[in-house]
Regions:
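A short acidic, glycine-rich active-site loop
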Residues: 53-67
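Short, ordered loop/turn segments at secondary-structure junctions
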Residues: 37, 113-114, 143-145, 186-187
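Local beta-strand N-terminus motif with an aromatic residue
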Residues: 1, 104-106, 136, 150
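Structural beta-alpha unit
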Residues: 13, 67, 71-108
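Short beta-strand elements of ligand-binding domains
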Residues: 109-112, 137-143
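Small/aliphatic-rich secondary-structure junction motif
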Residues: 1-52, 152-205
């Protein structure tokens, strides 16, 4: 793991994600990127300095965001990490995924207060879409405290499709953290499987 991305809206759970990202970067000796996405009343990147003055509240918010990102950069650097910060405007989830792909991040860590919480405003879309579309593992930090290194990792799958690549990533993380891996297959009400039959794909896996 060489590069970790931490999208943040500076909320409480994103603060916890920032801390987790730093701890992971320390363990892996990775570079860490903090990314903040702002909604603006107009297409901000096309405004000149004179027109920006027409939106004093937005200018203030941008200043606060830059200051917070600067503090995050200093915090990471005090831990001996290489760090970069990014502030972008609008664009939604595409900006997050495009940024991650451009910089070849190996991992994404961010925070959410729920499916309709801060992550929705941060990414302009539901967090599940980010999880589904990202090409790298994503950790979403919610209200519970997160301890790191991880002690237990649950790998959830129907085990009917080829999930070997994803499982290799889980093994790599578990080995680095010294964590136990638990395999979980959920029997839904449409499966009509007995417990034993439901376990068969896991045993074959």
């Amino acid at each position: 793991m060489k590069n970790i991305l931490v999208p943040t809206d500076f909320s409480k759970n994103c603060n916890k994600a920032e801390e987790l990202g730093i701890e992971m970067a320390k363990l892996y000796n990775s570079e860490i990127h903090f990314f903040h996405l702002m909604k603006t009343p107009v297409e901000w990147v096309k405004l000149d300095k004179q027109k920006e003055k027409q939106y004093p509240e937005t200018v203030k918010q941008i200043g606060l965001a830059k200051a917070y990102l600067s503090e995050l950069e200093k915090k990471a650097e005090r831990q001996g990490l290489e760090c970069r910060t990014f502030l972008e405007f609008d664009g939604g989830q595409a900006n997050i995924l495009k940024h991650s792909g451009h910089f070849h991040h190996d991992f994404i860590v961010t925070g959410s207060s729920g499916t309709r919480g801060g992550i929705r405003e941060l990414m302009g879309s539901n967090v599940e879409k980010i999880v589904r579309k990202a090409d790298v593992p994503v950790v979403i930090v919610k209200d519970e405290e997160v301890s790191f290194p991880f002690k237990d990792i649950v790998f959830v799958s129907d085990f009917l499709q080829d999930v070997s690549d994803a499982f290799k990533q889980v093994i790599s993380i578990a080995e680095k953290c010294g964590a136990h891996i638990h395999l979980l297959r959920v029997n839904t009400h449409t499966d009509f499987n007995s417990i034993e039959k439901g376990l068969d794909p896991i045993k074959k896996f």
